[in-house]
UniProtKB/Swiss-Prot annotation, chain A:
Signal peptide: none annotated. InterPro entries: P-loop_NTPase (IPR027417), Sigma_54_int_dom_ATP-bd_1 (IPR025662). The keyword Protease does not apply. SUPFAM superfamilies: P-loop containing nucleoside triphosphate hydrolases. Disulfide bonds: none annotated. Keywords: GTP-binding, Nucleotide-binding. This is Rab-like protein 3. The keyword Ribosomal protein does not apply. GO terms for cellular component: endomembrane system.
Length: 230, 448
């Protein structure tokens, strides 16, 4: 496969949130039987039908790069990880719904990946702080996924879901909340599956059909600016 | 009256140290994790609080004896009863199956621990029949054995690792080109994994689609045909899967090597700064000190001797005799040995905390962080108790008697001998280990 055909999506998040289980679920539609710590990076491939159901349907291979580690690692580990952030087309941010810190660390994860991949005219963040404007201008599609939904008791569920909704809004991204040990959450036709499909479509569009993506992107920006004005 | 003053000094200093411990705990260890329980914090604090025996050095009154005894009792209580029970409780709560009878299983684990703890005392000559079962001496002797072993292991490793880390003589030369070459290899391996996984995914998809077609009731022969075709396909697939597994293992190795190279490059840059040069200089001193210690340990074992006077008094005596300088030996030796002992304790605590923090980061995850903190507290507690045992060696005679009083009748000579043996073993094995690791690394890069 030539490098031209590649669609690369990073899967980032703290240790133990369930990235490997999630990637396995996305690629094989099966639950991962024996999760163990990811050393370095593990890759898996998902076959995705772009614009499924329309005459323009085309099959693409999406590479899901699951990078292990913690956001507070030593600088040497971070610079080693940085080699995987080259030429990425999309990012899936994974956090654990039972652990608030993992959601907060997502800001740092996204900055780590985006800073590495900054284009010459792109936005540079110098002090590592979260800047909402940067995410508004960010052109790489993001998706926020919360795992371990089954471990949240019913009473706390609303509170947790509101918090994650704010989180997704900050990233200007869609969000999916699921349990990686249960394939039912991503069953075909469910709203989660639709969101996932839309995300992958966005990634492919930005990579291969730039003009089409750009016009859509600018339209949604205009819509959001109008909303904020009111 | 003086008793009150002393008590208040003790309490304030303990609060101070508690503050430090809390800061350390929150800042360094639990920076990235949220899930902790207050009970653990409590236990950790209590352990640190009660471990501050050395503070008694600054109390010049008879109440010192009382405070020492009190601190010791509290530490022992925590070390032997509370912390193991908590550890058992959290280990059990991590295992999903046993959720119902958490307490029961925790008690079972604790009883097992107590049994092994007691058995520990048998092979060692520390049981004197005049004391009862639950006396302080029994408990201290066992805790002392574990703590001394730990201390000797850590000192042995630290004594060898310290010069190795500080001195830039051992630093391998790493250039940017090396790192780039290794990174390229890593990315190439990832690409190969991806292309193989694409083939597997395509094969699965076509089999799935073909399987659907064949699910139509075409009868007996249709089923046989589908079996034969898929058998050939799946054999091919399992071969590719094996290749993928091998490549993934290779990619992990390459990743670890690259991380290692990055770390070495950072160290090289650090050693060019002033701080780095200072540490390099220190490294030479430390290596001499470590060689001396290993030498002394060997002599102690071979010639079966235990030192009678502490090194400071010895040193001062030597200076008085050979250099003819008039010193008030007793006065100076007391203060200098206090200071030296204080420095030794502080540096060893710092070394211990740093090593444990690194270890903690390496093996922690949000599930097991509770257990690890408790293990940390346990280790630190034992370390402190045994350091008191061993410090006795470096102190002048009057103060030795005080420690002997507090800790009861223990066979101190045995502990020193045991420390020397384990220290020697640990130092020699870490030399061997580091030598092998050092040799292996350049060879790997030669093969590039």
């Amino acid at each position: 496969m030539a490098a031209l055909d590649r669609v690369k999506v990073l899967v980032l998040g703290d240790s133990g949130v369930g990235k490997s289980s999630l990637v396995h679920l996305l690629c094989h539609n099966q639950v991962l039987g024996n999760p163990s710590w990811t050393v370095g990076c593990s890759v898996d491939v998902r076959i995705h039908d772009y614009k499924e159901g329309t005459p323009e349907e085309k099959t693409y291979y999406i590479e899901l790069w699951d990078v292990g580690g913690s956001v507070g690692s030593a600088t040497s580990v971070k610079s080693t990880r940085a080699v995987f952030y080259n030429s990425l087309n999309g990012i899936i941010l994974v956090h654990d719904l039972t652990n608030k810190k993992s959601s907060q660390n997502l800001y740092r994860w996204s900055l780590e990946a985006l800073n590495r991949d900054v284009a010459p005219t792109g936005v540079l963040v110098t002090n590592g702080d979260y800047d909402r404007e940067q995410f508004a201008d960010n052109q790489i599609p993001l998706l926020v996924i919360g795992t371990k939904l089954d471990q949240i008791p019913e009473t706390k569920r609303n509170e947790v879901l509101t918090r994650t909704a704010f989180l997704a809004e900050d990233f200007n991204a869609e969000e999916i909340n699921l349990d990686c040990t249960n394939p039912r959450y991503l069953a075909a036709g469910s709203s989660n599956a639709v969101k996932l499909s839309r995300f992958f479509d966005k990634v492919i569009e930005k990579r291969y059909f730039f003009k089409r993506w750009q016009s859509r992107f600018l339209a949604s920006r205009k819509e959001r600016d109008l909303e904020e004005e009111h | 009256m003086s008793f009150l003053i002393d008590s208040s000094i003790m309490v304030t200093s303990q609060v101070l140290f508690f503050g430090f411990g809390w800061l350390f705990f929150m800042r360094k260890l639990f920076k990235d994790y949220e899930e902790y329980q207050d009970a653990i914090l409590q236990t950790y604090q209590d352990t640190i609080l009660s471990s501050l025996i050395p503070l008694a050095y600054f109390l010049h009154c008879s109440s010192r004896y009382f405070h020492w005894k009190l601190n010791l009792c509290v530490i022992l209580l925590i070390l032997v009863f509370m912390v193991p029970f908590y550890i058992g409780y959290f280990v059990v709560s991590n295992i999903r199956l046993l959720h119902r009878q958490k307490l029961l299983f925790a008690c079972v684990l604790w009883l097992t621990f107590m049994y092994f703890f007691w058995k520990l005392g048998d092979p060692f000559p520390i049981l004197s029949p005049k004391h009862g079962i639950l006396s302080i001496e029994q408990l201290i002797s066992r805790v002392g054995v574990i703590g001394v072993t730990l201390m000797a292991l850590l000192s042995g490793f630290g004594a060898v690792n310290c010069p190795y880390t500080y001195m830039s003589y051992f630093l391998r030369n790493v250039t940017d080109a090396d790192i780039l070459a290794l990174e390229r290899r890593l990315l190439q391996t990832m690409d190969m994994i991806i292309s193989k996984k694409k083939r597997i995914a395509v094969a699965h998809r076509t089999m799935f689609q073909r399987g659907e077609v064949h699910n139509k009731p075409t009868g007996f022969w249709g089923m046989i045909k589908s079996v034969t075709t898929s058998v050939a396909g799946s054999e091919n697939l399992s071969l590719i899967q094996q290749e993928v597994d091998a490549l993934e293992e290779l990619s992990r190795q390459l990743f670890l090597e690259t991380a290692d190279l990055h770390a070495t490059k950072e160290r090289i840059e650090y050693s060019k700064t002033f701080q780095g040069k200072y540490f390099n200089f220190l490294g030479y001193f430390f290596s001499i000190y470590c060689v001396w210690k290993i030498f002394m340990a060997t002599i102690n074992i071979v010639f079966d001797r235990v030192g009678k006077t502490d090194p400071v008094t010895r040193g001062i005596e030597i200076t008085v005799n050979y250099l003819g300088i008039q010193f008030d030996v007793k006065f100076w030796s007391q203060h200098i040995s206090f200071i030296l002992v204080g420095i030794i304790i502080v540096t060893s605590i710092r070394g211990l905390l740093i090593t444990l923090t690194k270890f903690f980061y390496a093996i922690s995850s949000s599930k097991s962080s509770n257990v690890i903190v408790l293990l940390l507290a346990q280790i630190m507690g034992m370390y402190f108790v045994s350091s008191v045992l061993l410090i006795r060696m470096s102190m002048p005679l009057e103060y030795r008697t005080i420690i002997t009083e507090v800790l009861g009748e223990l066979q101190f000579n045995f502990y020193h001998r045991w420390f020397d043996v384990i220290f020697l073993v640990s130092a020699l094995s870490s030399i061997l280990f580091l030598y092998l690791a050092h040799k292996q690394a350049p060879e790997k890069h030669m093969a590039l």
